[in-house]
Amino acid sequence: MDRELNEHVMIERVEMIARLTAEGTCQERDREIALNLIAEIARGNLMKNNNFSVVFSAPPVGETFAKEGKVKVNITLDKDQKIGQPVIDAFQCELTKRIQSVFPSTRVTVKKGSMTGVELMGFDKDSDREALDSILQEVWEDESWR
């Protein structure tokens, strides 16, 4: 089970690096990491006699990446909670930093409104939404940014 979970995590990382490479924002070190992960996954699958293939395909020139500019996290905090603007700004700053470390092209907005709410746009995979939920919870519970 651990090996399968590790493979799943490695595959997600490889997919993320492939996406960044296709967008042109990937560093050479990231490519090396991806190739090493692919080799490790392939080696493990060869030992189990599974068929395995990896295909990378960059979008054609002139075609924008599907999520580019459309990936957004909008958070509304209830104005009745009496949260000061400096706290809201610090929350947005920390949230942006942590989310963009995983989803680089994401735009994060935090504002006051009539009720608390979270809107996620452009995140099609459930695993992406779960990762965002986890980041949101971690940042909100972490006192260090306040």
Swiss-Prot record:
The reported effect of P104S is:
In TUM2; loss of prophage induction
A biological process (GO) of this protein is: SOS response
Q: Which InterPro entries match?
A: DinI-like_sf, DNA_damage-inducible_DinI-like
The superkingdom of the source organism is Viruses
Query: Which Pfam family would be a valid example here?
Result: DinI
**SUPFAM superfamilies attached to this UniProt entry:** DNA damage-inducible protein DinI
PANTHER family according to UniProt:
DNA DAMAGE-INDUCIBLE PROTEIN I, DNA DAMAGE-INDUCIBLE PROTEIN I-RELATED
What's this protein's family per the entry?
Answer: Belongs to the dinI family.
Query: What's the stated role of this polypeptide?
Result: The TUM protein is responsible for UV induction of the 186 prophage. The other three proteins modulate TUM activity.
Any idea what this protein is called?
A: SOS operon TUM protein
Q: Which organism is it from?
A: Escherichia phage 186
